[in-house]
Amino acid sequence: MHSLKLIYFKMRALAEAPQMLMKFADMNYEYLMSWDYFDDDWEMVKPTIPFQQLPILIVDDEHQIAQSTSIMRFLQRLAGMEPQDPVVAAKADAILESAQELFRPLNPTVNFAVGKDFESKKESMLPELSSRFADLERALLNGGEKFFMGDKPIACDFTVYHHLDISRNLDPDFLCQFSRLSEFVRD
């Protein structure tokens, strides 16, 4: 068994999906804030870590795995949840990447925008989200199961769930127009 430490900031953004996957797979891990793990200010730490960004997953106090989707794929593999069929794995990766692309419009608005700035960003983002959610709903319907690639969740499911869930901070009713995605989040 590997020692796992997920390092991030105190915000809801890129560490939720890995934590959901690790909890689901009953993996032991520590979740640490950057300043606690590195014992230094972010500006001092940033140049020393891969790609100068978080989250990172520390494996066995030796290896640093950067980039959210790489972390998700590693954890999925470690938990034995990776699809064995290469075509299914590629389709799952496409869904994972598509979900991750939702981070850019959602995160700055949900976590940092307030007042009129929030309302303005929300209104300009909803048409794009509607199109992206329609794509995800179609993929979920084409999967024909409870989850995107079958009857058990894998990395893409946790990532999609996280982004759909935080989108409800924009408009609690927005997701209702996508009945299958709403069911996915509810279940």
Listing of model-derived features with the role each one plays in the protein:
Residues 92, 147-182, 186:
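GST superfamily/GST-like fold recognition
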Residues 1-133, 142, 148:
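GST-like domain detector, emphasizing the conserved glutathione-binding G-site
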